[in-house]
Amino acid sequence: MDENKKRALAAALGQIEKQFGKGSVMRMGDRVVEPVEAIPTGSLMLDIALGIGGLPKGRVVEIYGPESSGKTTLTLQAIAECQKLGGTAAFIDAEHALDPIYAAKLGVNVDDLLLSQPDTGEQALEIADMLVRSGSVDILVVDSVAALTPKAEIEGEMGDQLPGLQARLMSQALRKLTGNIKRSNTLVVFINQLRMKIGVMMPGQSPEVTTGGNALKFYASVRLDIRRIGAIKKGDEIIGNQTKIKVVKNKLAPPFKQVITEILYGEGISREGELIDMGVDAKLVEKAGAWYSYGEERIGQGKDNARGYLRDNPTVAAKLEAELREKFQPSEAAREEGDDEGDDE
């Protein structure tokens, strides 16, 4: 760059700093690029698949899937992990369906959880913005986008047609929220539902679509698709669900990784079940017939007994987890490459 251009640029940068404050514009090389802070999800498999050890702070995350697939369970586990690390959590329950007893079973400290059950979508998003701007909340969950009903719809008649109202509300809210989220380093998780597209479908295109328009797809740094793929049985009794979680979008590490984990009724994600599955894959746990062995010790006949052994022996579980973390060490957060990866359906 010639001297005249350098002087002009320096003058422009000086004027910008004077008008908008120090740090409004900076050279990327002038600051140390630090790894993104993350909040663990409660699932070791998912933390590794996300590439940064959990859900990123200072970002928007969308978790979507069919009904009863484990969306709220996953967010409650993330809240529990955040609270264990001394963080503050807020839950905006637009569906008015949060069960505090179930949340407590998953490890959430319900006494310290900030809960809001707003009347309208505008109220929910305004409360979310105020909590984010306070800078004192580490994780904020909105459950769910589909339940964020615009005020005009609530005040109108039952059959009124108000096309695009919710999409406009979400678009406006996210424009306002994202800057505050980055500044306050808050993780904001939006839970979303699926709907079916009506009309002509292109071959190979999914008929499923998330609610609330397209804005959230663009603003989200991480999008997770969570689905129930089978039942977990103990004899004839169903004790949980086998669940597939796919990282559909990830701006911080390579996307499209997927994990199959277990969600047990009344317990949440089975940490011990994950350790066994990952241990077998990594050849740290040996499976001979129905028996599982770790090191010199047999830990159980059948997965349920092996799971019980690890639950009763937390030191053994911690040792196995440490070995697995060492083997599957998440790589450092890659630099964000924008929205041009073609990762939205």
From Swiss-Prot:
Entry's Gene Ontology BP terms:
DNA recombination; DNA repair; SOS response
Q: Name one GO molecular function term.
A: ATP-dependent DNA damage sensor activity
- Which cellular component appears as one GO term in the record? cytosol
- Organism domain of life: Bacteria
The record's annotation in SMART domains points to:
AAA
Task: Give all cystine bridges in this chain.
Answer: none
Concerning PANTHER family, the annotation shows: MITOCHONDRIAL DNA REPAIR PROTEIN RECA HOMOLOG-RELATED, RECA
Which HAMAP family has this protein been placed in? RecA
Report the protein's function.
Answer: Can catalyze the hydrolysis of ATP in the presence of single-stranded DNA, the ATP-dependent uptake of single-stranded DNA by duplex DNA, and the ATP-dependent hybridization of homologous single-stranded DNAs. It interacts with LexA causing its activation and leading to its autocatalytic cleavage.
The family line of this record is: Belongs to the RecA family.
Name of the featured protein: Protein RecA
Q: What is the lineage of its organism?
A: Bacteria, Pseudomonadati, Pseudomonadota, Gammaproteobacteria, Lysobacterales
